[in-house]
Every structure is written in structure tokens, then in C-alpha cells.
Design a protein with these regions (language model features):
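Conserved alpha-helical substructure of the radical SAM core
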Residues: 1-88, 92-93
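Short, charged, surface-exposed secondary-structure boundary motifs
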Residues: 85, 107-111
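Radical SAM enzyme [4Fe-4S]-AdoMet core and its adjacent flexible, acidic
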Residues: 29, 69, 98-102, 110, ...
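Short linear motifs in exposed loops
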Residues: 85, 244-247
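Short, surface-exposed charged micro-motifs
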Residues: 3, 233-234
């Protein structure tokens, strides 16, 4: 997981990324720093979350450099800048845009706290597919989710000719403004058993971009021991904290 910046053009209530101090939000990892981290890690798949990666002034260079290294890149985006940014990229089997969508129009716009985001994201998805790009969606399910509405949403996504759908429970962010919507383990199992029942029975052939073992984990049918090295993450957060600490020591009155 490569996080070249934490800035975003949305303020989603279930996300704590933009709550970082200003010094951290100003940071952009250089393409060279990104390449060095990816080469050191050695993982074949690189997910680029945010903030909003398309705000990075050199995101096209970062993505192309990773593709040149034969890395499978999942560029996460809320879709607001995607359509006008497509000209910066070239369709490739190594590049997938992963568009954040947490439900149909009313639900998604509520989650991102801005009207019109859903429609703009859908338009961007269609434009990207028309130009030959791979596109998946990334959905977070929170505690107040209605299982039937989530199923309707998955049916809607299935008609968009996507290259896959990703879904995840709402994991806790310490700094997120809304702390009430995150799911505990037992809530997660009960909710996903209901949501995924049509998929489990074979009634709905939803095209999830997941190992089925993960979906079984969500439903509580299996369990795993997590490891901190299971998904290595690299960002400018540690560097920014070091610089801020140094600045405060050198300029104590600021």
C-alpha cells in the first residue's frame, strides 16, 4: 500500500485521513521515493490510496514508473477528478482505477457529505471504460447499512461492465469525525451473512475482486491470524512527523 499523500477534496465522516496535521497534509512523496519503497518491498500489487491520489501533481509519473516495473497498480479515487485526468494515463492490464462508491446516490452522497458526487463518479467510470481502462469499485459498509439496499447497489454495479467490485466493513479510524458507524466483529459477521446471502447461494453472480476466503471471513465462516507484514504500507507520515519534531526543537516558540 503506497500512500503518496493524505490530502483529499472530500471530507467523508468515516475517514480520518484529512484530520492529520497541516504539516503532514502538505506532504507529497516524490516519484523516486515511491519507486524505492516499491522495489524494497517487492510486492507484485501496489494499491495507491489517499487522500485523493489524483491531487498529486506527479501521480501520472508515479503510476507509469510502477507499470514500467511490471507492478499491478490499483489507483484509488473518489472519481471527482478522474474523467478529466484520464488523458494523463494509458490503458494497461497493469493499471486499474478503483472508484470509491458506498451505495446508490442518496447513500453515497450522504457518506461523502456532498451532493452530486455519486453521479460524477458514475460518469467517470463510464468514461474510463469507454477509453479502455480497467475499473473496479471500492465499497465500505457501515453499521447503519440496509442489507437489501446494499444488494440493490451491487446489482446496479453489475450493469456497469466493471472489472470487479471490492467491499469491506467500516474499520475504525481514530480521527474520523463519525465514530458511531464502525462495525465490531460480530456485527460484521451478521451483516455480511445477510448481504452476501444471494452471492453465497449462487442467485447473484456479483463479480467481486476478492479471494473468496476473504468473503468467507466477512461472513464469519473462517478466521485468520492477522500479521502486521501482511500488507506493507509506505507513506510520508513518518517523515513528516520527524520533520515536525525537528522543527519544534529548533524553533520552540512556533
Amino acid at each position: 500500500m503506497l500512500e503518496p499523500l493524505f490530502r483529499c477534496n472530500l471530507a467523508c465522516s468515516g475517514c480520518g485521513k484529512i484530520q492529520h496535521p497541516t504539516e503532514i497534509l502538505k506532504q507529497n512523496l516524490s516519484p523516486e521515493a515511491c519507486f524505492a519503497a516499491v522495489e524494497e518491498c517487492g510486492a507484485p500489487v501496489v494499491s495507491i490510496p489517499g487522500g485523493e491520489p489524483l491531487l498529486h501533481p506527479q501521480i501520472d509519473q508515479i503510476v507509469q514508473g510502477l507499470i514500467d516495473r511490471k507492478k499491478f497498480v490499483y489507483l484509488c479515487t473518489n472519481g471527482l477528478l478522474l474523467e478529466k485526468s484520464l488523458s494523463k494515463f494509458t490503458p494497461s492490464p497493469y493499471l486499474t482505477f478503483s472508484v470509491h462508491l458506498d451505495g446508490l446516490k442518496e447513500q453515497h452522497d450522504k457518506c461523502v457529505d456532498r451532493d452530486g458526487v455519486f453521479e460524477k463518479a458514475i460518469a467517470a467510470i463510464k468514461a474510463a471504460k469507454q477509453k479502455g481502462f480497467r475499473v473496479t469499485t471500492n465499497t465500505t459498509v457501515f453499521a447503519d447499512a440496509n442489507p437489501q439496499e446494499v444488494q440493490e447497489f451491487f446489482n446496479f454495479l453489475s450493469d456497469l461492465n466493471l472489472d470487479g467490485m471490492m467491499v469491506s466493513p467500516g474499520y475504525s479510524y481514530e480521527w474520523a469525525p463519525d465514530q458511531e458507524g464502525f462495525l465490531q466483529r460480530e456485527q460484521t459477521k451478521a451483516l455480511f451473512r445477510e448481504i452476501l446471502a444471494p452471492w453465497k447461494s449462487g442467485k447473484n453472480k456479483w463479480n467481486f475482486n476478492h479471494n473468496p476466503l476473504f468473503l468467507e471471513f466477512l461472513m464469519g465462516e473462517t478466521d485468520y491470524e492477522c500479521t502486521p507484514w501482511g500488507s506493507p504500507s509506505y507513506s510520508g507520515f513518518r517523515l513528516a512527523k520527524t520533520l515536525l519534531s525537528l522543527k519544534r526543537r529548533l524553533l520552540p516558540n512556533l
